[in-house]
């Protein structure tokens, strides 16, 4: 599972010119599910996202989470995060999870964010052609990849989230 997490002043997503999701100060997340991803990965990713301390405290240090600042989130599905470009110039998406299963993990991730204290979690429309607008704050952009966490010997239930 891959997630590109961006600290934003605000973000919105539109389909056919109509805004379908938006957030104020907080995080905008691009979410991609891969073939080997599990519900446990979605839960861990949500826990890590909610606890990620990338907002500045009174001393200017990145020491606060989106929960700490009562921030909002916009989560957008993006299967192209799972692209493989090792061979040739055209990306292969065979590593992306099939849409029905990926949508379930996407929705689970959003629900787990709420369970982890995020009060406002809005989304795009899964599988739609979307136009995304945002003001990236910093910029601060973090990449999460649960496959790398697994390969480094970290198990989902033992990764630190503090």
Region locations from a protein language model:
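A short beta-strand-loop-alpha-helix capping motif that often carries His-Thr
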Residues: 63-80, 126-137
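Positively charged, low-complexity, intrinsically disordered RNA-binding extensions
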Residues: 93-156, 162
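RNA/tRNA-interacting regions in translation and RNA-turnover enzymes
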Residues: 11
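Residue-level signal for inorganic ion chemistry
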Residues: 45, 76, 140
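Flexible glycine-/small-residue-rich
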Residues: 7, 33, 77-78, 134-136, ...
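Compact, glycine-rich, soluble single-domain proteins
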Residues: 19-70, 80-95, 99-111, 115-116, ...
């Amino acid at each position: 599972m891959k997630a590109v997490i961006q600290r934003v002043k605000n973000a919105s997503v539109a389909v056919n010119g109509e805004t379908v999701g938006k957030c104020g100060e907080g995080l905008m997340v691009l979410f991609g599910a891969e073939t080997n991803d599990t519900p446990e990965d979605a839960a861990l990713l949500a826990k890590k996202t909610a606890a990620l301390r990338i907002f500045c405290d009174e001393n200017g240090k990145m020491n606060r989470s989106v929960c700490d600042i009562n921030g909002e989130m916009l989560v957008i599905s993006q299967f192209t995060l799972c692209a493989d470009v090792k061979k040739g110039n055209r990306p292969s998406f065979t590593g992306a999870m099939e849409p029905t299963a990926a949508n379930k993990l996407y929705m689970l991730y959003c629900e787990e964010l709420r369970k982890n204290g995020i009060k406002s979690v809005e989304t795009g429309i899964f599988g739609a052609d979307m136009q995304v607008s945002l003001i990236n704050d910093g910029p601060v952009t973090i990449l999460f990849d649960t496959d790398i966490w697994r390969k480094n010997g970290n198990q989902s239930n033992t990764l630190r989230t503090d």
